[in-house]
Structure formats: structure tokens, C-alpha cells
């Protein structure tokens, strides 16, 4: 029997506001334990939450970017559960009226086709703290993360393969990153993914019993965990077994999923409206203000790069991987840079440098202006493509004018025949044996002179001009 795979994803995204959702404490990542806390985060008696308007702004932007309807009257709810990293014994979240609902995004599949994935809802909530279980037998609670604003984006169960889930996450991450509401760094926990997967016989409308997957700390692991579950569940069903509703975690070391707990039924969190927060009215003016702040998104930029600039689909995809890179590219082209040459540099030397340094393009000194200037002085023969690599490294580390650096460092390419011909004659005088080999007709003897000339000019001879002049002067020797 063959089975159809049914996948839905729940994605938690930390919003990059300066302060937390209901307290003035810093929401920044990486501080000492409990450094970013105050009485609200610790839930001292009598303290009240105060809404951070920037969180609602971010929620509206996310809803618009994901083609969602927006609840014009929005409220928060209490989700009741007890855990040490949740000092209130409830989480302030949204239940029946999330900020966004009925959305969708389009994904691109490996065969080049596209598919629309529906998004059920996107709701705002506060994050919980973090428990650390020490080797000394004690557990430690860090509430720096307590109250950091989240938006949870819940897809419909529209994905039919692990590959589609991977494509969905890639597209979702791009869109959220372009809005500027989150850096979506999985390694820092600002994007976290839970997956729900079930199988059903082809032709059956009713969903099978779902399994929830956790500990998915990369898109690659999401795909691997889902692939393992497809095989595990199919094997179990074919042998006459029954799928239990359970939560499993992906174990990277064993390349498989491991049981965490069996779910006897749906959790009863006893949601009720949060009495300490008012109803928030989101009018059209507020929505229009947030819409005006949204950029052009990756899909539209890719289409523009292919149709208007003549780039390949691959180049367009690489250049839109992040908004910062795409903005850099567009600025460089607007300054007169050739689109293909700018693209080649960004995907070649620039990408290699960023990977080696572990930096993003915003974190180096290279600018669109000095990259375009460098490309121009390659084109006019001031420097060679080989020398440009050295110039680029200087610009990436120090910034400034490419032309000014080339002139100051003495890197200007020698193209003047009046300068090169005497150097060629000196090369002949210094290498009599090579001249004798050439005159005697020894095979490939002429090729040695190119190296001699480049050494004599410290690599500054224009290769094209040098080859022409060498051929001319060698012919005179033969004559």
C-alpha cells in the first residue's frame, strides 16, 4: 500500500524589538543569565503588562507580507500551564482572534513548478525562559528570554513531501527577513520549527494520526526528520501497526527520531481573555502605514533581475538570498555597474570573503560605490582582473576609493608600449639562453618570456598588451 504524506509546520519567530513585549527589559540575545529581567519578567505580585506597540507593528507587517487578513479588533489570551521557566504559570498569547489569518505564500519546487501553501494563522505571544539542567544535580532558570516577543506562524497541512516543507521554510524565512521584523537566525533561536506529519492511503480524505517533531535546529534537519518519519510510519502501517499521537525529537547523531512523550489527547490550556490588557483596534490607517514600510519581496526581485537585467534564474536566486545583498546589488547597478559583472563579484570573491570571515555584507567596508569603481578600472585597463582581487580585499577591510588605493599602492597596470618595449628588450638581454632556444626553433620557447616579463614588471604589465608586444618583438628576433 502506498501512502500520501501530510505535513504542517509551526514556526516561532522572535521579533527584533529593542524591548520585550510587555516589559521594558532588553530583548537582545546573548547577555549573562537573568541580566535582561525586571519585576514584570519575574511576575512579582501586583505588576501589570504594558504592551509594546512595536510588536503589533511587526505583527501587521508579517500578516501583510504573508497575504493574510488582519483582525481589526485584536485581543490577547492567557494560556495556562505550569513550568519553571514560566513564572506566571500562564503565557500571554492569542487564541481565537490572532493578528493574522487566512494567508498564503508561494513556494518553488525542485522541478521549477510553484505551489501555494496556505497559512492558517499568525499570532503574537511572549516567549518563555530557559531551563538548564546542570551536572551538579540542580536545574537553573534564565529568564532573559521570558517576555521576548514572538509571532507563531501556523501553516495548513498543505505540504506533501519533506522537500515541500524545506521549500516552504526557505520562502518563509526570506519573506520574514525582508520585512526586517526578525533576523531569523536558527542558531540563536530566533526561528524555531515544529513539524506535524501523518500518512494516509492515497484516495482517503481523512488525515491519519499525526506525530509532532521537535529539536529541528536547521532546515536540513527538518527535512531529514520528516524523511525518517515517512519511512518509519509507512513501515509501521504496512506491518499492521497503529500510529500513536506522540511527540518525537530528531537525533542528529543517529539520523532518526526518538520518542519524547505520548499524547493521550489535546492539551487543555484553559484559554481565557487576558484581563490586564485592553482590546486593540487596528484601523486602516495603521495597516497602510505598515504596508508603506514593506520592501519589494524576493519573488518580485527575482523576476525583475531575470526579465529586466537578463540574469539567470540561478543568479537571481543567489542575489536575493538576503535583503542586504539584494539591496547592495540594486544600488551598485543603479550607480552604473554592469549587472552581470556585479553579480559575478558578489557571488564569487565577495561571497568567498564573507564565508572566510564569518561576516555579512553589512559588516565589511565594501560599498556599492567602490565595487562599481573597481569594476570600472578593470574595464579601462587600469588594473588586471588578477590584481583586482587584491584591491577587493583592501576595500572589504578598509573601504575608500578603489582608484585612489591603486594609485597609492603602485598597482596601476602598465599598458604603454613606450614603457613595456624597453623592459622586453631588457628581458631578452637578461635571458640569453631562452633567446637562443627561441631562435633555434625550440617548441614553446616563446612562452617563457611571458613569465619573465610579468616578473620584471612585478605583475603590472597589461596581459593583453604585453602579449601583443612580446609577439612583435620576438618576430623581430626571428627576422
UniProtKB/Swiss-Prot annotation:
Keywords for this protein: ATP-binding, Ligase, Nucleotide-binding, Protein biosynthesis
PROSITE patterns named in the record: GATB
Molecular function terms from GO: asparaginyl-tRNA synthase (glutamine-hydrolyzing) activity; ATP binding; glutaminyl-tRNA synthase (glutamine-hydrolyzing) activity
Domain of life: Bacteria
EC id: 6.3.5.-
Keyword Amino-acid biosynthesis appears in the UniProt entry: no
Catalyzed reactions per annotation: L-glutamyl-tRNA(Gln) + L-glutamine + ATP + H2O = L-glutaminyl-tRNA(Gln) + L-glutamate + ADP + phosphate + H(+); L-aspartyl-tRNA(Asn) + L-glutamine + ATP + H2O = L-asparaginyl-tRNA(Asn) + L-glutamate + ADP + phosphate + 2 H(+)
Entry-linked InterPro entries: Asn/Gln-tRNA_amidoTrfase_suB/E, Asn/Gln-tRNA_Trfase_suB/E_cat, Asn/Gln_amidotransferase, Asn/Gln_tRNA_amidoTrase-B-like, GatB, GatB_C_1, GatB_Yqey_C_2, Gln-tRNA_amidoTrfase_suB_CS
Single biological process term from Gene Ontology: glutaminyl-tRNAGln biosynthesis via transamidation
Stored HAMAP family: GatB
Subunit record text: Heterotrimer of A, B and C subunits.
Role: Allows the formation of correctly charged Asn-tRNA(Asn) or Gln-tRNA(Gln) through the transamidation of misacylated Asp-tRNA(Asn) or Glu-tRNA(Gln) in organisms which lack either or both of asparaginyl-tRNA or glutaminyl-tRNA synthetases. The reaction takes place in the presence of glutamine and ATP through an activated phospho-Asp-tRNA(Asn) or phospho-Glu-tRNA(Gln).
Family statement: Belongs to the GatB/GatE family. GatB subfamily.
Protein name as it appears in the record: Aspartyl/glutamyl-tRNA(Asn/Gln) amidotransferase subunit B
Species name: Streptococcus pyogenes serotype M28 (strain MGAS6180)
Gene label: gatB
